[in-house]
Amino acid sequence: MIYNRCGKSGLKLSAISLGFWKNFGHNGVFSNMEDMVHTAFDLGITHFDLANNYGNPYNGSAEENFGRILDRGMREFRDELCISTKAGYEMWDGPYGDRNGSRKYLTASLDQSLKRMKLDYVDIFYHHVFDPNTPLEETALALDNAVRQGKALYVGVSNYNARQTEEISAIFKELKTPFVVNQPSYSMMNRWIEEDGLDRWAEENGVGISVFSPLYQGLLTDKYLGGIPEDSRVGRGDTWLGGQLDDDFRKKLNALNDVAHERGQKLSQMALSWVLHNSAVTTVLIGASRPSQIVENTESIRRIDFTDEEIARIENILQNKH
């Protein structure tokens, strides 16, 4: 495993991290969840990313299951793990549990997360989504307070653009809060952080980037090269990106798959390598439904290098110039 320093902080994150957005709720098979976490840890994945609203059939069930996994033999490795959680989206009924960044919501949510996972602290506590209705000073103070109370070691933001990140970063600097990471979506098919300048800003200002959806909701895999399998996320209607799987998109997938094959990789592996090739990126969060996917995706760290020709070919494919 490769471990990258998170921005200019002393914290190192595994280049591949395991995300708990899907497949860790109570509607899943617990033994499979446990096997996935054990497989990840055995492969050197030390960063496990959660959020208060992860899990089905109800919010918080992913954190509950992770707490159970820790209880069953992993809690002794706590100091070898980097555990992050987030709060920001709607979580419970009433005005204090809706989507927001207030001090009341963030404080209560972190306490609930710690209780579900049976932890004294998390390593990183994120504000999950920018809230235009709450002053940034209040959100920043809530995150700072979590650190001062010993409930979090570092703080981060997610789904903040470059301007929003710069603004809250300035507040954190005044407070001397250990702000170390932004968590945006980013992939070959979703390059908004390049267009927005978030990746360059983060690199220049010593803030790490932890990428979610690097496989574009699972579309950047060989599963969809010939169509839409019934047992896939798109086939089940489990992603809002299914409508993009038209003939043009599949042509791109097949062309990218050819490049990956020539590199000795699967399409999903090359897609992860491509994201990690961006020097601003600290880690990519992978989702998984079975342990073998974690093994396969972790192999991507072996080929983070790309030739100029490969980069040009990929760019031409993405720009419909192939």
Regions found by a protein language model. Give the residues of each.
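Active-site groove signature of glycoside hydrolases
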Residues: 114-134
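Alpha-helix N-cap and loop-to-helix initiation/capping positions
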Residues: 28-35, 58-61, 65, 97-105, ...
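Beta/alpha (TIM)-barrel catalytic core signal, keyed to glycine-rich beta->alpha loops juxtaposed to Asp/Glu
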Residues: 134-322
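Hydrophobic faces of well-ordered beta-strands that scaffold small-molecule active sites
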Residues: 14-18, 48-50, 81-85, 125-127, ...
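Structural motif
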Residues: 39, 43, 116-117, 149-150, ...
